[in-house]
Amino acid sequence: MRLTIDHHTRYQFSEPQARVVQLLRMTPADHVGQTVSDWRIDVDCDARLRDGRDGYGNLTTMLYIDGPISAMELMVRGEVLTDDSAGVVRGCTETLPPLFFTRVTAQTQADEAIMALAETVVGSGTHSADRAVALMAAVHDVITPRPGRTEKTITAADAFALGHGSVRDCAHVLIAAARAVGYPARLVSGHCLDGPNAASHSSAHCWTELYIEGEGWISLDPSTNRRPRDSYVRVAIGLDASDSTPLSGTRRGGGIEALDVDVRVALIQTQG
């Protein structure tokens, strides 16, 4: 597929800010099944941008704005060519061993209910892609994805108890369940042409990768109950969403910050 992505973020501050610093994880990298043909980041005010990589190997951009500033708009646009890799992850920059991704975070702590689900599905058998897919399906059956962007951060255990959550919450539940039975697991942020948030244009997408010994990393999307294919664009990874969120940062100044996000993914039709 040839996909275009437009990710606009608008900040409005109730009081002028003396300085704004943002860490952007919004630039996808090339790997098997994904080629970035065009990508750019624009800001509607004077700003300094510095590209780099974080500890996970994600492409990053540091954004620095000196005030006073009362509003700003960040525009990320690009075009990505994707091929169907059947949910198998290859050719990515890997800076950390799979064992690192067995670490439990506050967002991905499994409670007794999540552990019981994982043990019922996976049991004590050898880890395999089939068991990982079965675990994804089990998580999909017990937590309903709610489209849209959410400001409230809840844990995997809370989302599991509620029985619904954002695509981020669905991913956190699968990560918690997978780690509970020994799978290295990580969260992926990116974009999806036909995901739960496609109609609302309100946020990017999240899914999960699990490591299978002898096979490598495989992609699983518990919000759609499928293995990501060529309608997905992979951008960043982390232990949980806090490590791979598209935007994070600080500001120097008082008042309230209002954020408006519009994300659109489109398929470029080709003649042939």
PLM regions: where:
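Short acidic/polar alpha-helix capping motifs at helix-coil junctions
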Residues: 3, 23-26, 136-142, 171
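Secondary-structure boundary elements
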Residues: 80-84, 90, 95-165, 173, ...
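Secondary-structure capping and boundary motifs in well-ordered enzyme cores
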Residues: 68, 163-166, 200
